[in-house]
Amino acid sequence: MDTNDKFMPEFGVRVFLVEDNAEHSFIAVTVIRQLLGEASEVIVAENAEEAVGLIGQFTENDRPDLMLVDLRLPDNGGFSVLTAARSSEACASVPTFVITSSLYDQDIAQSYELGASAVLCKPLSRASLREELIRIGKLPASGSAHTTSTH
């Protein structure tokens, strides 16, 4: 048994990604699967309205293990998604990483005030996501739960 198996449920990790840009969504899904394994389920919402609706449908049994939310959705949608997540009985305790290209201190501060676990810069990098996953205990410090060969 690989020592990393305890970090990977047999069915993979369930990640909820809220991203309106198709290219950024593709990058995020790729990085998530590199770090957490191909068996990881990535649920993608393309806008705040869709995300808030899905958050309202999650239960304790099917909630995501991690949420990644684009802060700069149209109409300040990222903030509404954070608010909905923290107001949801099922999702209130789910680690939530904000991904953003915003350099405004106010945006970053408000993200943390609304319950973000971390704020990561766009485009999402493997190194930054890995560091935060280790920090919250979703990955062992020795490396990723899923190893890919570079040969």
Feature map (PLM): residue ranges:
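Short amphipathic alpha-helix used as the core "switch/output" element in two-component signaling
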Residues: 53, 79-92
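Alpha4 helix (beta4-alpha4-beta5 surface) of REC/receiver domains from two-component response regulators
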Residues: 30, 80, 103-118
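Non-catalytic signal-transmission and effector/linker regions of two-component phosphorelay proteins
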Residues: 1-16, 22-41, 60, 121, ...
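Active-site residues of response regulator receiver
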Residues: 69-71
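Acidic catalytic/metal-coordinating carboxylates
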Residues: 47, 77-80
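Acidic, metal-coordinating helix/loop segments flanking the phosphotransfer/catalytic sites
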Residues: 44-66
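His-Asp phosphorelay/catalytic-motif detector in bacterial-type signaling
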Residues: 12, 38, 62-65, 90-95
